[in-house]
UniProtKB/Swiss-Prot annotation:
A motif (Meso-diaminopimelate recognition motif) lies at residues 407-410. It comes from the Bacteria. This is UDP-N-acetylmuramoyl-L-alanyl-D-glutamate--2,6-diaminopimelate ligase. Its cofactor is Mg(2+). Catalyzes the addition of meso-diaminopimelic acid to the nucleotide precursor UDP-N-acetylmuramoyl-L-alanyl-D-glutamate (UMAG) in the biosynthesis of bacterial cell-wall peptidoglycan. Its EC number is 6.3.2.13. GO terms for cellular component: cytoplasm. Meso-2,6-diaminopimelate binds at R383, D407, N408, P409, R410, G457, E461. It is found in: Cytoplasm. Belongs to the MurCDEF family. MurE subfamily. The gene is murE. Keywords: ATP-binding, Cell cycle, Cell division, Cell shape, Cell wall biogenesis/degradation, Cytoplasm, Ligase, Magnesium, Nucleotide-binding, Peptidoglycan synthesis.
Length: 491
């Protein structure tokens, strides 16, 4: 593709050189540049790849996209924002693949992963070959791939969409992070349905204020309706029980469909009842009301199911098909996942890493707890410090016993992180055990029959980051090991 043809997709008045070389690939990593590449420079938090433009040119880059003039011997296209330009260029270069997909984007603080997995099951049941992009993994049909970020970088994203189309995928569900929205990674993505789960405190290390965080999430809905294909109706599926929804309603040109429990909505749940074996409720839609029994536990999971139901209905899936899927849902790895080693107490691993999600998980556990509730929780290093005392407060408020431990301390001193947490403790029903493995073994050793142990924060993760080192660590494996050890000692 010629350079002039490629950059014609940019509509923010780029400064385009007269030269018109052939572009054979797009790269954002100078180390991957080869003959014919278009190298896009981006200024990150720690590295500014404008500094590697000469290296890219020396490696054969045919042209460079930058935010400032660069002294190189190849054509330079000047743009206002290279992050967003990369997304649009990648979309165009790979044939605008999302135009060929029914694309569903899910954003919010909590519930994205579970909702996306439910939605994927619903679309499969409707006969679609599906793609899935999210926190746990990426799927193309029945193939599964590991991921580094909730939402990949713009280049990887468009390459993935193109691969999905090539493999016959016609419907894709993806989690859309606030970082991806703020950095413009999803510019060029033609969403058909955008889903909002909820907004609570998280990522303030990046966004600085809740107002900025709210704005970033809202970009998905503000951009929805600016369709590349005017024959496709666009839908914003919004949680009517969240106060932010009113603002998102005003910001979108798409058709709004609401769901909720406490506020009158298009799709609702009533008469919710929970046991340790599942949840029952009445699903109310504009068409009919249906009694639902599902294996998933918790009010938060009812919200996830409502979001997926509303998104499924606007995607043309019958209510009957949706109900059949809900009844068989087995849960998502690391989301209220029970670790069963034959013990007489319950061990649950959950990804809850925000105050709101931790509160929801602990409240749910207390609803069917016959004994004490233990909560093992930590907070990530190099991340939002303001939520540390709040997380600690939630743990002591809703658990009988709280154990503060390490999560992914990264470059921070684990003891300093825990000190931040202790400042939020309510009462004295907590203890501090820095080593996460030791903390899990300690709780499992102390638990009595019918107690519940919640191991929060890491969920599906199979690693722990200490300093710059990434160690294998899986809460589920450690818990199973501790359960087995205790059972063997009791024989």
């Amino acid at each position: 593709m010629k350079l002039h043809t490629l950059v014609s997709c940019l509509h923010d008045f780029p400064v385009v050189p007269k030269e018109n070389p052939e572009i054979t690939s797009i790269e954002a990593d100078s180390r991957k540049v080869k003959e014919g590449s278009l190298f896009v420079c981006m200024k990150g938090y720690t590295v500014d790849s404008h500094d590697f433009a000469k290296q890219a040119a020396a490696q054969g880059a045919a042209a460079i996209v930058a935010e400032r003039p660069i002294d190189v011997d190849v054509p330079v296209v000047l743009v206002k924002n290279t992050f967003r330009s990369l997304a649009v260029l990648a979309d165009y270069f790979y044939g605008q693949p999302t135009h060929k997909l029914h694309l569903i984007g899910i954003t919010g603080t909590n519930g994205k992963t579970t909702t996306s997995h439910i939605m994927d099951e619903i679309m499969r049941a409707h006969g679609h070959k599906t793609g899935l992009i999210g926190t746990i993994n990426m799927k193309i049909g029945d193939e599964t791939f590991e991921v580094k970020n909730t939402t990949p970088d713009a280049l990887t994203l468009q390459q993935t969409f193109a691969k999905m189309v090539e493999h016959g995928v016609d419907s894709t569900v993806m989690e859309v992070s606030s970082h991806a929205l703020d950095l413009g990674r999803v510019h060029g993505c033609d969403y058909d349905v955008a889903v909002f789960t909820n907004l609570t405190q998280d990522h303030l290390d990046y966004h600085k204020t809740m107002e900025e965080y709210k704005h970033a999430k809202g970009l998905l809905f503000a951009q929805l309706g600016n369709s590349y294909n005017h024959n496709r109706e666009k839908y914003a599926v919004l949680n009517n029980d969240d106060a932010v929804t009113v603002e998102y309603m005003r910001s979108t040109a798409a058709t709004v469909v609401t769901y909720g429990i406490d506020t009158t909505s298009d799709v609702m749940a009533k008469d919710i009842a929970m046991t340790s074996g599942g949840t029952t409720f009445t699903l109310v839609t504009p068409y009919e009301s249906v009694n639902v029994t599902m294996k998933l536990i918790g009010k938060f999971n009812v919200y996830n199911v409502l979001a997926a139901t509303a998104a499924g209905l606007v995607s043309g899936v019958s209510l009957e098909t949706i109900i059949d899927v809900i009844k068989e849902l087995a849960g998502v790895p690391g989301r209220f996942e029970v670790v069963d080693g034959g013990q007489n107490y319950t061990v649950i691993v959950d990804y809850a890493h925000t105050p709101d999600s931790l509160e929801n998980v602990l409240k749910t556990a207390k609803q069917f707890a016959k004994g004490d509730v233990y909560c093992i929780v930590g907070c990530g290093g190099d991340r939002d410090r303001t939520k540390r005392p709040i997380m600690a407060s939630v743990a002591t408020q809703y658990a009988t016993h709280a154990i503060y431990t390490s999560d992914n301390p990264r470059s921070e001193d684990p003891a300093a992180i825990l000190d931040d947490m202790v400042h939020g403790a309510n009462g004295n029903n907590y203890e501090v055990i820095i080593d996460r493995k030791e903390a899990i073994h300690h709780a499992i050793t102390k638990a009595k029959a019918d107690d519940i142990i919640i191991i929060a924060g890491k969920g599906h993760e199979t690693y722990q980051i200490i300093g710059k080192d990434v160690h294998h660590f899986d809460d589920r494996e450690v818990a199973k090991e501790a359960i087995t050890e205790r059972l063997n000692n009791e024989e």
